[in-house]
Amino acid sequence: MSDNDHFERATDMDSHPVDRAPTQADDCRRQRVIDAAMQVFLSYGYKRATMDDIARTADMSRPALYLHFKNKTDIFRAVADHMFELALESTSLSLAQNGSLADRINGAIDTVMINLICQINSSAHGEELLDLKNSLAADLVAGWHNAVAAMFRDTIAADARQRGIDLSARGLTAATLAEMLMDGLEGMKRRVSDADSQRKAARQLVRIVELAIA
């Protein structure tokens, strides 16, 4: 371990954010750190990035950085949480658009699951960051998964009602179809790497859901 790693670890153990209600200025500074950290992680990778790198990119001192985040892991989780929040907002907007069930779900998948991942993967350290999310932010990933599944469930249920389809009479529920779709998308991401093939596979999964309520 390098001297810098020893110093960062010692500092991380002794440093804690101020225990008080956050102000609007605090929120703005936190967001500035999150934006800066994303740039740093994409440029250097998580392992090589330091708190000094993040503080410098955020245009603040290292002590000021520690007023808002305990350590690098805390910042990584904040970055992941912010990205998941944006992804959920985009999913909600896509599903609220006019169009068929398939068009709306495919739009959400394109925007949130394919395009976003491609943007991250296009960086030199994207693969490292995507791998780390499962070890450093597994609870956030699970929360995002459940939230998207719930959005898909509600969208499918609303479409079935509009069509006058009783899913229970077919041995199905909107929740089951939504989870099947999410599981299929997760498996697709593991075996298909390029975006065009992912879109094709995703559309086939959505088509299965559409046929279930036709």
Residue ranges and their predicted role:
Residues M1-C28, L167:
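N-terminal intrinsically disordered/low-complexity leader segments
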Residues D3-H6, D110-M113, A150-A157, L167-R191, ...:
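Hydrophobic alpha-helical segments that form the core
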Residues A21, V79-I105, H125:
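Amphipathic alpha-helical linker/stalk segments
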Residues D26, I34, A80, F84, ...:
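Amphipathic, non-transmembrane alpha-helical scaffold segments
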Residues R32, A36, V40-D74, A78:
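Helix-turn-helix
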Residues S43-K47, N98, Q119, R163:
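Short coil/turn segments at alpha/beta junctions that flank glycine-rich nucleotide-binding fingerprints
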Residues L88, C118, S135-Q162, A175-E179:
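Amphipathic alpha-helical packing segments from all-alpha helical-bundle domains
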Residues D103-G107, L116-D139, R190:
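Amphipathic alpha-helical segments used for helix-helix packing
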